Structures are given as structure tokens and as C-alpha cells.
A protein has these predicted regions:
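Basic, polyanion-binding surface patches
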Residues: 1-96
Length: 96
């Protein structure tokens, strides 16, 4: 059992047919709205969320505190999302 081997604790979601891993600082519970097997594109809807207070700033998830991990398929590695590289709705304004 991978869950037991990892040493994490789970409980059943009240909203979707999936386990909730209690040690995760952020959980987004989603339902599938559509899936295109030809492209692999999946569209989902978030139906519930749980966030640990430690990753929030003014009630909003703070990526710097969360330190999300992404999978890099090109190098088959996991990476931590890091530095700010731009500011939305501001940096592109001079290009108009």
C-alpha cells in the first residue's frame, strides 16, 4: 500500500470520489467537466478546497509560502515553482 508506505494519513472526500491527504497544505477537490482523449485535454471544476493557514496571506493562497511542485516531463524531474518573473496586468501595458 503506497499510502501506508509514504506514512501519510487520508480520509474520504465528502465532495468527490477521492482521498484527501491530510498532510498536504492545499487540497483542491475537482470534478471532470469534459475530457478529449484525442488531445488529452481535461477540463475540471473545483468543488471544494482546503488550505492550511500557514500558506495563506490575507486569506489567499500565497505561492511563495506554498512552494508548489510541478513535474517537468522533458527532464523527468520534479521542480519547486520559484521566483516572480513578471506582474500580471501591468508588465505588458507598454506593449499596447
Amino acid at each position: 500500500n503506497k499510502i501506508e508506505h509514504a506514512g501519510v494519513h487520508v480520509h474520504k472526500s465528502a465532495h468527490v470520489n477521492a482521498p484527501i491527504i491530510e498532510e498536504y497544505p492545499l487540497t483542491l477537490e475537482c470534478t471532470v467537466k469534459s475530457y478529449d482523449p484525442a488531445t488529452g485535454i481535461l477540463v475540471g471544476a473545483i468543488v471544494a478546497e482546503q488550505a492550511d493557514e500557514a500558506i495563506l496571506t490575507d486569506g489567499v493562497v500565497d505561492a511563495a509560502k506554498l512552494k508548489p511542485i510541478v513535474f517537468d516531463i522533458a527532464t523527468r524531474t520534479y521542480r519547486v515553482v520559484g521566483d516572480v518573473v513578471g506582474h500580471a496586468w501591468r508588465d505588458g501595458l507598454p506593449l499596447r
